[in-house]
């Protein structure tokens, strides 16, 4: 990133959220603790014993947080990249998002990799420790459609904020 983008500010934020994706990502998008989401937005809360996807309402929770925070409509897109087709669409259309006040892109690859790392024998060997895991992640990023899309924005006037719901 350093070769293509100027880092104006680097901050770290910490929380007491559970590291499970279903809690942490919903909390990031809602701006609330899991217990507050359950209390105030029960229609978007999915309990552990329910078979429904636990992160199906990120967009709705983000919309609610924006309304609470800005108290006005903003031009926004939320893109959740869960497959190659969506990744290609994002890459092809990335410049269109420059007109937005906010564009949120969720890339599920790191989640998939972290879960597969403990379940698939080949990944257990390839990512046997943190150093190997980070190396695989870096290699993926450098060859990903996400990086390709970001490089198309080189020299454009926009702010990029990178966040994660993973501790490492």
Residue ranges and their predicted role:
Residues 1-168:
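Feature captures the catalytic ectodomains and active-site-proximal regions of enzymes
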């Amino acid at each position: 990133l350093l070769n293509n983008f100027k880092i104006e500010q680097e901050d770290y934020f910490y929380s007491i959220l559970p590291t499970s994706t279903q809690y942490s990502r919903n909390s990031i998008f809602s701006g609330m603790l899991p217990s507050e989401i359950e209390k105030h937005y029960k229609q978007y809360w999915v309990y552990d014993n329910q078979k429904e996807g636990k992160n199906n309402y990120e967009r709705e929770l983000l919309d609610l947080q924006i309304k609470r925070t800005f108290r006005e409509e903003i031009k926004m897109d939320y893109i959740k990249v869960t497959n190659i087709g969506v990744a290609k669409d994002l890459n092809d259309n990335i410049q269109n998002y420059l007109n937005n006040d906010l564009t949120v892109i969720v890339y599920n690859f790191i989640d998939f990799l972290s879960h597969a790392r403990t379940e698939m024998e080949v990944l257990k060997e390839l990512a046997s420790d943190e150093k190997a895991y980070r190396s695989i992640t870096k290699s993926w990023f450098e060859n990903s459609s996400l990086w390709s899309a970001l490089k198309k924005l080189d020299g454009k006037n926009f702010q990029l904020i990178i966040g994660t719901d993973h501790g490492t």
